[in-house]
Each structure stands twice: as C-alpha cells, then as structure tokens.
C-alpha cells in the first residue's frame, strides 16, 4: 500500500465505534477509569439483544464515495505495516467480497465486527469464521441499525454475525441476565489441548503462553444492546471478573504478545 494512499485514507472522515459503558457488576478494565457503571434498573422495560462478547480486534469495513474499500481499527484506517498482521485474513476476505459488500454498504454504511485471527486473552478453537459482524452505522441518519435491520441489510451474503443469546424485554433481575453467561460457543471442551498444540506448532514458550491466556471455560462476558424497531439506541457490556484478572496476570498487552492464531 502506498504512502499516497495512507495519506488519502487518513484524510477521510472516520466513524469511530463508540465507547461501551459497563453494566452494574461488570469488572472495569484498564482505560475505564472515570466511567461509572450503569445500574441495571435503567434497563427496566427495554427491548434487549444480548450477544456473547467475543475477544478480538474491533474492525470497521466501509467504502469511500469513489467506491474504494476501507478497513479501520478503532481510531485509524488500516494502511499496511507489520503491526497489522492480525488483520491479514479480514483484508483478504473483504477484498474477495468487495462487490457484494459495496452493493449492500455503499458509502452510507459502516459495518463493524470482531476480527478473531489472533488470540488476545481468550483462545478459541471452534470459530466458524475469523470476522464476526456486530453493528452497522448509518452515516445518513447518524444512527446504528437494530439487529433485525442489520439482518435484513446483510441477508444472503458471506457475513457472519456474533452469537445472539437472548432477544426480548429486559429480564426482571440482573441475576437473570447474568444467567445467560456460559461456555463460549466458539470453544470446544478440548480447547486446552488445541491451545497447547498450537503454541508448540508456533515454536513458543508454553508456560508463558498459558500465563497470557484466560483459563476459564466461560465466555468473556455479555454485550447488551437496547433497541427499538430499527435503531440500536445504547449498548452496555458485562465482563466477568476473572477475565480481567487474566489480562492483568498476563503482564503484557495482547499487541505485544507473540502471534497465536485462533482456530
């Protein structure tokens, strides 16, 4: 990718994915200082869509007014370089399906998803894909589409979405919502053996790799959306406490850790 394109990409308006506040009882992580928890009672009567919170890299896919494919992560466009290794799959996949994506997204929509090619804190051994869509932003209205609206927009195509665990009125108690937390749908009971095999195949130190890996069977947490018929109006996350402890115990951010591929 040329320096000219990098400069051009950075000049484009980037729709950054909004920060997600924590729900009552969720364990705060580094960078969350100063952000209060949202009380569960604030969700009373709301229509919720609850998803498994996957541990990957936030990625956006969109198109310029000239129809050029653009990929972004957090606050910048992906413009090449060694630090973008984990995005290699999604770059190839998006380019292969650029025609279909352009037809659905145009320069109006930004599709956000989780890129799962590299292990962050959680190792997955049963991923059906390495990109999972979870939100679509409408530049024309300044709103995020509801789950049914996203499904309609992306129907009959190559896009997989994050697992949905519940759709309906907010459960009466926080405990009822937390009961949705269970083993990750993207891990098998044999994931530990698969992890060790992958680490050895990569020629990495197994003890250190385990130090930098979440050891729980449970998913990272829950991602909760508040929706109307056509719009996602708010989103919250609930992260289990021992997941955050696993991050602290690793002593190194995932971006500084060796590349261990998810399966």
What residue spans do the PLM features occupy?
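Core nucleotide-handling region used for phosphoryl-transfer chemistry
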Residues: 2-263
């Amino acid at each position: 990718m040329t320096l000219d394109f990098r400069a051009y990409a950075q000049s484009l308006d980037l729709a950054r994915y909004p920060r997600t506040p924590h729900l009552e009882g969720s364990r705060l992580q580094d960078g969350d200082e100063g952000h209060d928890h949202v009380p569960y009672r604030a969700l009373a009567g709301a229509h919720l869509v609850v998803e498994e919170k996957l541990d990957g890299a936030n990625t956006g896919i969109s198109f310029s007014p000239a129809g050029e494919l653009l990929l972004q992560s957090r606050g910048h466009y992906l413009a090449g370089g060694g630090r973008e290794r984990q995005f290699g799959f999604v770059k190839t996949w998006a380019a292969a399906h650029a025609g279909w994506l352009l037809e659905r997204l145009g320069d109006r929509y930004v599709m956000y998803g989780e890129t799962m090619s590299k292990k962050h804190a959680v190792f997955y051994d049963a991923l059906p894909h390495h990109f999972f869509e979870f939100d679509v932003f409408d530049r024309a209205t300044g709103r995020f589409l509801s789950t049914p609206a996203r499904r309609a927009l992306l129907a009959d195509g190559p896009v997989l979405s994050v697992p949905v665990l519940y759709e309906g009125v907010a459960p009466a108690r926080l405990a009822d919502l937390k009961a949705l937390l269970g083993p990750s749908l993207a891990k098998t009971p044999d994931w530990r053996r698969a992890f060790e095999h992958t680490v050895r195949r990569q020629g990495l130190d197994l003890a250190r790799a385990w130090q930098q890996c979440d050891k729980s069977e449970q998913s990272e947490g829950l991602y909760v959306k508040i929706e109307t018929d056509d719009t996602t109006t708010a989103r919250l996350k609930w992260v289990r406490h021992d997941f955050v402890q696993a991050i602290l115990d690793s002593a190194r951010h995932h971006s500084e850790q060796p590349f261990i591929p998810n399966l």
